Amino acid sequence: MTDRIELTTANEFIARHIGPRAADELAMLHTLGFDSIEALSDSVIPESIKGTSVLNLPAGQSEADALASIKAIASKNQLFKTYIGQGYYNTHTPAPILRNLLENPAWYTAYTPYQPEISQGRLESLLNFQTLISDLTGLPIANASLLDEATAAAEAMTFCKRLSKNKGSQQFFASSHCHPQTLDVLRTRAEPLGITVVVADETELGDVSDYFGALLQYPASNGDVFDYRELAERFHGANALVAVAADLLALTLLTPPGEFGADVAIGSAQRFGVPLGFGGPHAAYFSTRDAFKRDMPGRLVGVSVDRHGKQALRLAMQTREQHIRREKATSNICTAQVLLANIASMYAVYHGPRGLTQIANRVHHLTAILAEGLSQLGLNAEQAYFFDSLTLHTGGRTAALHAAARARHINLREIDDQRLGLSLDETTSQSAVEVLWDIFASTGQTLPDFTALAASVKSRLPAALLRQSAILSHPVFNRYHSETELMRYLRKLADKDLALDRTMIPLGSCTMKLNAASEMIPVTWAEFGNLHPFAPAEQSAGYQQLTDELEAMLCAATGYDAISLQPNAGSQGEYAGLLAIRAYHQSRGDEHRDICLIPSSAHGTNPATANMAGMRVVVTACDARGNVDIEDLRAKALQHREQLAAIMITYPSTHGVFEEGIREICGIVHDNGGQVYIDGANMNAMVGLCAPGKFGGDVSHLNLHKTFCIPHGGGGPGVGPIGVKSHLAPFMPGHARMQRKEGAVCAAPFGSASILPITWMYIRMMGGEGLKRASQLAILNANYISRRLEEHYPVLYTGTNGLVAHECILDLRPIKDSSGISVDDVAKRLIDFGFHAPTMSFPVAGTLMIEPTESESREELDRFCDAMIKIREEIRAVEDGTLDKDDNPLKNAPHTAAEIVGQWSHPYSREQAVYPVDSLIENKYWPPVGRVDNVFGDRNLVCACPSIESYQEA
């Protein structure tokens, strides 16, 4: 009998996303003692929450059908020529960067570079980004990106609060010339912290003694270029710090903030080759003085050496970060915008200092020509000095001019009923300027002569603020200006790294699953990429349909009643969720409720976020099995019942198990007046099996860059939407362009909107059945690894049935005691086997947390398990003295090609060092550096490009 012929393509993508084949799945189930995936699921999910799933989605579409569906949605967006500006500008993404970086899985599927030996390529690109920012802003220390300009401004405000010597002040000055969306996010961030944001015109500012800090815009949002030198001195005289939000392209021509007194510079790198994307994702930047480096938010790439003394890069000063300092961290930000920072970095590498300056001069000269022509037409710009933006007093003609422009498919900036604005960019041409003149000209007026004006117009930048210092003198910005050279440079960097295109990345709590090509394709479509976030609503009908449908999909997956897609990272989702809880309590007159219970096992973002939301953290204990100690929770909830605001709990737990008592935990908190925040970091084990909104959660954030297939990008972008029950829906993030105006947590109404198509595609192709199977296979793969390795490494935590959820924790502490081999040694040795290490020492020191996801095949799981078992054999050889306790393959891992061909003095063979298993002979990853010296890097901090001689040595 022949196989049944399928006449439909429904659900065919499921098998592309799921790793194990049917026969492998059955064999793995038998290893665990089950005969079906349903039986395994039934055994893992606690009785108390079975039946809570409300997932009711149609069958999955084929890849071709889903692409056709989303193309139809995208076509509803109208692409007008946009001159709105306000922090967002049209730009050209150079084709070699688009093809070799943005569309290259070697770049977009990588994880945050916590393992430096396998991350040297993107670390170098990020160091280039830091050098770019430091050079342009005139401040010596820059981080490796933040989420967007508005949240960077909020980070600058809290940074100033920590460091200002005006300790009694709770007031922060923000110029009324800042971008409006920045001011909105500042207000959101300030209120829970008891900070008052005073918005005023700095040109009319008198006494400044009441402020601990200030934020100024350079050039101003309306186009003005102000000289802030005297004002900066006044603020410093009052012991206040000065932050400046600066336009990077303008800084190629203007005096950098660091040279006129700024303590901090922040802004967006969007116009360096990153599409508008309806508001994101874009890389923000943050730079400061050397004295303040230990208080910087975000990640910082620094130069160190490996064990051979060779230059190597790493993430520096990690003790500032939330996963270590928890509620005392400088920020709650984890994932930032690495992929976008790398695009901006390579944009600068490709154009170089001369190319960037030419672009800036062209933009400015066209703006000056436009302004002079408008003056001839009777419209004078309000600005005496400007870079690329103009404000025009158009009086009673304002509405008609907007209408005339839109009739020509052009958007101008709406300011008020008497004024409008224009911002030019690198895509503006002579013909575009002439069209603008035609729109503004009254009937019968002769249009200006472009050629004549181009020959006569003068610069409209203030002479006193023209840049004198050189930019981007490092050779990396002066070499790769042909496409051939840039293509090979990007390939060289990519070859240094390990990403999902080469190997499984089994990081616990990170869900490094497949980012399917069909999911990624719409991201680079112009219909999604070239829309301004503040374009008139009727032009974004496609995005509106996309977000409406995606919100409904996520409600179905979680059991919540409403979704906000605005938070542009998981950390911001946490923050938005706690703000919703806080606002809910305040609306009921319960302002005194400010205690947040957090289990001791929680990720460091939880306490850091609670602190940002104005809550006091009370830690609850965990029992010997890693579960929340319910009696301790009950006692603390009762003790603080009058002040209890919330609990933040991760489910399945951070320890990788489905806690049996989750319903009871939720009930205890509710009975004592609190709300339940369920961290959705581990949602990949629950979709289709149980729903947090149905077993006690009031709010959760979701990591679309984990469960729902947005790639990690080497450390961003991420998306962290929140789902809420109906009583919290009125308190979700708002925006000036939404029905609720207050509570914006990022600059754009839909955050990182242009990558939302990835999640839409994933859900649409998987359908309800596929999403459930993804959860089931994630659980199967984790338990298969756990079972294969348990006789070699103790599995630290399991549920009452001896099973784990979607990840497992291996306890290496006994090995450390018996052999001296540390978790770090095992992690580095895995590199010699071609693997990225699992999560190290989280949530328990001395352990490895492994999450294989549903996308990995049994063959890859076995390859990983075989590597771990082989490593255990090497450890036994250390234990019994066969291998030297100090000079062995683990202590010296990873091994480089240069070491292998050099003088060999180790008591073990070269073959054992680099070919410990036969499969490596045909497919070997060579780390570019040996083990990196972390202590050296922090003691000798260098966070900009070192000399060219260092590169030649590398």
UniProtKB/Swiss-Prot annotation:
GO terms for biological process: glycine decarboxylation via glycine cleavage system. The keyword Oxidoreductase applies. It holds the Pfam family GcvP2_C. GO terms for cellular component: cytosol; glycine cleavage complex. The modification N6-(pyridoxal phosphate)lysine is found at K706. Keywords: Oxidoreductase, Pyridoxal phosphate. Its EC number is 1.4.4.2. One of its GO terms (molecular function) is pyridoxal phosphate binding. Its cofactor is pyridoxal 5'-phosphate. It catalyses: N(6)-[(R)-lipoyl]-L-lysyl-[glycine-cleavage complex H protein] + glycine + H(+) = N(6)-[(R)-S(8)-aminomethyldihydrolipoyl]-L-lysyl-[glycine-cleavage complex H protein] + CO2. The glycine cleavage system catalyzes the degradation of glycine. The P protein binds the alpha-amino group of glycine through its pyridoxal phosphate cofactor; CO(2) is released and the remaining methylamine moiety is then transferred to the lipoamide cofactor of the H protein. HAMAP family: GcvP. Belongs to the GcvP family. The glycine cleavage system is composed of four proteins: P, T, L and H. NCBIfam families: gcvP (TIGR00461), PRK04366.1 (NF003346). PANTHER family: GLYCINE DEHYDROGENASE (DECARBOXYLATING), MITOCHONDRIAL (PTHR11773:SF1), GLYCINE DEHYDROGENASE, DECARBOXYLATING (PTHR11773). This is Glycine dehydrogenase (decarboxylating). It comes from Pseudomonas syringae pv. tomato (strain ATCC BAA-871 / DC3000).
